[in-house]
């Protein structure tokens, strides 16, 4: 990823402390029936989480204009949470990658915060973009 535009989406630079991306990582997104778009950037050799599992991740989230609204990389600390307690796009998307893997998600508003947004950082009806490294599955 770089600070360029693809399909009118601005991508911020890859966080400096992010792990490596597979050399054969896809350049194009795949889509699920729900409308979630994703690219598995590093497959990961471990277990895929289910909605009842707790995951530990590093992530960066940005809007379609490239503005980063949240980043565990920038805070220098990963985060753990039950996969059932996050937006639908995360719950669905994280099941597509194994422990140790990295995925890029493009989450439509109906799988994110919808019409309400999330405070000042995420406006209503925003498509959200995430780079997520799945560190552990518990």
Positions of PLM-derived features:
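Cross-family detector of peptidyl-prolyl cis-trans isomerase
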Residues: 1-138
């Amino acid at each position: 990823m770089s600070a360029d535009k693809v399909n009118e989406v601005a991508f911020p630079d890859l966080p400096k402390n992010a792990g490596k991306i597979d050399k054969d990582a896809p350049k194009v997104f795949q889509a699920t029936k729900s409308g979630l778009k994703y690219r598995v950037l590093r497959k990961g050799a471990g277990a895929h989480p289910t909605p009842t599992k707790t995951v530990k991740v590093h992530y960066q989230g940005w809007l379609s204009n490239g503005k980063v609204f949240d980043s565990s990389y920038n805070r220098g600390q990963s985060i753990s949470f039950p996969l059932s307690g996050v937006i639908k796009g995360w719950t669905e998307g994280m099941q597509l990658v194994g422990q140790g893997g990295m995925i890029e998600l493009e989450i439509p508003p109906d799988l994110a915060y919808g019409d309400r947004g999330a405070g000042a950082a995420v406006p209503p009806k925003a498509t959200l973009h995430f780079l997520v490294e799945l560190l552990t599955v518990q």
